[in-house]
């Protein structure tokens, strides 16, 4: 460590003589690959003062040195001494010379349509069930594979934008799939013709997108600029930019955007203000949000099966709050320890009652909640913090991982009635395993080995025998068309 300190001291001195800010050089060396040039974000989030408003400098220093749960952010304590960490923190909280801008004009100018939808045939060009296709995101080399879910054979593979968000969304008929990249690009892909229809850059640092249940609108939530961007779902042309700010005008980033199909609305969590938005679209463009006050910032949320209630939580690990969406009333507070990942939670019926289970990204537990009284039923102890959870209506098990723990090569199968761990799978010992998705009929479960020399592993969902293994480059997620457009029990929405 003394040698590291000496080397960094010499480096910082040389940079000071050259007139370059030490923190800027350290950022380029250690941070830029993930967080982007100019701190505008890449596979990691934007690192500008406004995006760090909820993080105190001392907390940022702790993250730099020791990493952050639930992310790919590793600590740099072995590479940076105290002076270097302080210099880097000072740089991150310093405003850039020019405020980053991405206007409506920039969005419109970025739109391209290589294969307009009206010019493409309306029937699939392949012999496979279009509702049992899987869209597989391979983050290792930024590609997407379209997989036949009956034969488990690739139909197509194409390059994607850099650092896709893991959850693509689909048109109601399953023909079109919409991708969002962390650097703001939205891609519209025709699964019938295996072609990119259109692309547009909706922002500089994007969280995710949602598609309306009538197939008319795409809503994109951005960290930078802090706004919502409404697009026409047919060609990604810009409809409207909606600034994210509370009723008092306090600006915010957008945490998440989801569709609530029975409500015919989008629901939006705001990261920096105590508001939740609902934007109805049944009678026109969803541009006028209904503002619901919330007790805490919402970083993550999930719906009840009937979409009447929303269960939300903050990264500050203060438990969960339940919001009744019609009235905006807070109907319950749930004591959830650690950092539950509600967006990956799933629900099922147990003894005739709906229950909700969520993994936890800071503790090795699965929290199970009774959705009739909002009381915790059980904390299932696992071998480490996890990220994903999946099931199927015809599966007796909830499949989850210990993605962020020491036993990150394990997949746990939890009996949905006894709430006990029934089986453990290790598809590739020593390599990270995570993210399960079922075929449309629930017969097979596909899981990812998250490695550049990784694989998509197909299991018989009942016998738990391995059926097939397809080599892939870090398949971070796979999404079954039929399950997604049907908002199937056991999958993410």
From Swiss-Prot:
One Pfam family cited in the UniProt record for this chain: Cytochrom_D1
Q: Does the keyword Ion transport apply?
A: no
UniProt GO MF annotations: electron transfer activity; heme binding; metal ion binding; oxidoreductase activity
Q: Which GO terms describe its cellular component?
A: periplasmic space
Q: Which pathway is recorded for this entry?
A: Porphyrin-containing compound metabolism
User: How does inactivating the gene affect the organism?
Assistant: The mutant exhibits decreased dissimilatory nitrite reductase (NIR) activity. In the absence of this gene, the formation of the acrylic double bond of heme d1 does not take place and dihydro-heme d1 is inserted into the nitrite reductase NirS.
Q: Where is this region: D1-heme domain?
A: 114-468
State the Gene Ontology BP annotations: heme biosynthetic process
Q: What is the effect of changing residue 165 to A/Q?
A: Abolishes heme d1 binding. Loss of activity
**Keywords assigned:** Heme, Iron, Metal-binding, Oxidoreductase, Periplasm, Signal
Which positions does UniProt annotate for heme d1 binding? 165, 167, 169, 182, 207-208, 341, 390, 435
| Outcome, altering residue 341 to A/Q | Still able to bind heme d1 but lacks catalytic activity
Q: Which domain of life is it from?
A: Bacteria
Where found in the cell? Periplasm
Tell me the leader sequence span.
1-18
Into which EC class is this enzyme placed? oxidoreductase
Record's comment describing the protein's domains: Consists of an N-terminal domain that binds the heme c cofactor, followed by a long linker segment, and a C-terminal region that exhibits an eight-bladed heme d1-binding beta-propeller domain.
The family note in this entry says: Belongs to the cytochrome c family.
Q: What does this protein do?
A: Involved in heme d1 biosynthesis. Catalyzes the introduction of a double bond into the propionate side chain of pyrrole ring D of dihydro-heme d1, therefore converting dihydro-heme d1 to heme d1.
Q: What's the subunit arrangement here?
A: Monomer.
Q: What is this protein called?
A: Dihydro-heme d1 dehydrogenase
**Native source species:** Pseudomonas aeruginosa (strain ATCC 15692 / DSM 22644 / CIP 104116 / JCM 14847 / LMG 12228 / 1C / PRS 101 / PAO1)
Give the source lineage, highest ranks first: Bacteria, Pseudomonadati, Pseudomonadota, Gammaproteobacteria, Pseudomonadales
Source gene? nirN
């Amino acid at each position: 460590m003394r040698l590291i300190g000496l080397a960094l001291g010499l480096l910082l001195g040389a940079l000071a003589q050259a007139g370059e800010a030490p923190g800027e050089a350290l950022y380029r060396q250690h941070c830029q690959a993930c967080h982007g040039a100019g701190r505008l974000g890449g596979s990691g989030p934007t690192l500008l003062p406004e995006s760090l408003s909820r993080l105190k400098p001392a907390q940022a220093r702790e993250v730099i040195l020791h990493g952050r749960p639930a992310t790919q952010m590793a600590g740099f304590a072995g590479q940076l001494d105290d002076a270097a960490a302080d210099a880097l923190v000072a740089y991150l909280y310093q405003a850039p010379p020019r405020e980053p801008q991405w206007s409506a004009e920039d969005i419109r100018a970025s739109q391209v349509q290589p294969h307009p939808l009206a010019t493409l045939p309306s029937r699939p060009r392949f012999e496979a069930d279009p509702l049992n296709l899987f869209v597989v995101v391979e983050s290792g080399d930024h590609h997407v594979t379209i997989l036949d879910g009956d034969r488990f054979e690739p139909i197509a593979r194409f390059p994607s934008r850099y650092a896709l968000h893991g959850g693509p969304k689909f048109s109601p008929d399953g023909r079109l799939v919409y991708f969002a990249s962390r650097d703001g690009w939205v891609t519209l892909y025709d699964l019938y013709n295996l072609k990119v229809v259109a692309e547009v850059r909706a922002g500089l640092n994007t969280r995710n997108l949602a598609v309306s249940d009538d197939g008319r609108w795409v809503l994109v939530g951005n960290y930078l600029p802090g706004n919502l961007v409404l697009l026409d779902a047919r060609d990604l042309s810009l409809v409207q930019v909606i600034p994210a700010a509370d009723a008092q005008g306090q600006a915010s980033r957008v945490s998440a955007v989801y569709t609530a199909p029975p409500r015919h609305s989008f629901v939006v969590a705001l990261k920096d203000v105590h508001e939740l938005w609902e934007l109805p679209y049944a009678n026109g463009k969803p541009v006028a949000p209904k503002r619901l006050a919330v007790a805490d910032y919402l970083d993550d949320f999930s719906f009840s099966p009937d979409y009447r209630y929303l269960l939300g939580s903050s990264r500050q690990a203060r438990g969960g709050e339940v919001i009744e969406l019609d009235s905006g009333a807070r109907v319950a507070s749930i004591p959830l320890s650690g950092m539950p990942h509600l967006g990956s939670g799933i629900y099922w019926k147990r003894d005739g009652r709906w229950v909700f289970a969520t993994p936890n990204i800071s503790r090795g537990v699965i929290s199970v909640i009774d959705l009739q009284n909002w009381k915790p039923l059980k904390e299932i102890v696992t071998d480490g913090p996890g990220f994903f959870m999946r099931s199927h209506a015809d599966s007796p098990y909830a499949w989850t991982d210990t993605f962020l723990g020491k036993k990150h090569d394990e997949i746990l199968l939890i009996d949905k009635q006894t709430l006990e761990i029934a089986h453990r799978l290790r598809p590739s010992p020593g390599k990270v395993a995570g993210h399960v998705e079922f075929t449309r009929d629930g017969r097979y479960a596909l899981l990812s080995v998250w490695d550049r020399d990784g694989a998509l592993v197909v299991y018989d969902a009942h016998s738990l025998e391995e059926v097939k293994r397809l080599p892939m480059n870090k398949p971070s997620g796979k999404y079954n068309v039929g399950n997604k457009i049907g908002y199937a029990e056991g999958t993410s929405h």
